[in-house]
Amino acid sequence: MHSTRSLPLIRFAAATALTVLSVAASPPPPLGPLPDRVTFASADGQTNLVGYVFKPEGPHATRSPAVVMMHGRAGPYSSLANGRYDATTLSQRHQKWGHLWAQQGYLAILVDGFGPRGFPEGFTHQGYSQRPESVNEVTVRPFDAYGALAYLRTRNDVAPDRIALQGWSNGASATLATMSAATPALKSPTPTTGFRGALAFYPGCGLKGKFKTGLLPYAPVRLFIGTADEEVSPQDCSDLVDMSRAQRADLTLKIYPGATHDFDDPGASRQDIPANAAATRDAIAAAIAFFAAALRS
């Protein structure tokens, strides 16, 4: 039996433990200034999307180049969001890249294509076959990318003909479908009417069987994937790129030995893997150089 004198100590210890658990279960603090939340229409004509705008940091042009960012199957938010889905709970990876582009003088917008459709928490890898058609990365999400493109062109701080695209995992698959010259989301796309170029990080390259004979993008596309990817097939991507390049597609693939899925996630669980850290450094440098060339005036 505890004495009356020891009760305050017990209560203090319990309160401290609860505080520690609460902090541990909360998303990490923001990596920089919070992005602005905006809304805009998907090019599907029926979905009102949410976007998070990272504005250029430091000296920049009156009208800046821009990057549209497409999240993966887990959605744009931290796994620790705990029901709060806003700018304060964006995943570290999306924050990192948003601020990276802002530091390069670009405006970046992260598109939330899942939350407005009722799935803000995203999906697990295991449940791929059960995902609803409303978030199909090949037939639906490209319309979201072009909705973001149209929105950016209404802003007076964006260079309307200097906009690029980046996606991760499921969003990288959506990026590939978006960049196809045969995309249903934009008639007769060109680098002027569409995107100037695109980056696809560890996409699933099966693409619902829609591009079995190759993918012909209307602007340059660069893919990045690791040999130790646990979720998607590097071989599928290699086959897709080989078939596409045989038809003179401007599509290239960088394969990182030993790198996993999500290799660029800044969390310790990924960056403590040496192959991931090396792949991240190389991919960031390649991405910066690629967009510098693609988005120059």
Show which residues each predicted segment covers.
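Bacterial N-terminal signal peptides that target proteins for export
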Residues: 2-13
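Bacterial N-terminal signal peptides
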Residues: 11-22
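N-terminal cap/lid segment of alpha/beta-hydrolase-fold proteins
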Residues: 27-62
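Serine-hydrolase catalytic machinery in alpha/beta-hydrolase-like enzymes
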Residues: 63-154, 265-272, 278
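Alpha/beta-hydrolase fold active-site loops
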Residues: 64-67, 162, 196, 220
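Primarily recognizes the serine-hydrolase "nucleophile elbow" in alpha/beta-hydrolase
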Residues: 76, 136-216
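The feature captures the conserved acid-bearing segment of alpha/beta-hydrolase catalytic domains
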Residues: 189-255
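C-terminal catalytic histidine-bearing segment of alpha/beta-hydrolase fold enzymes
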Residues: 250-297
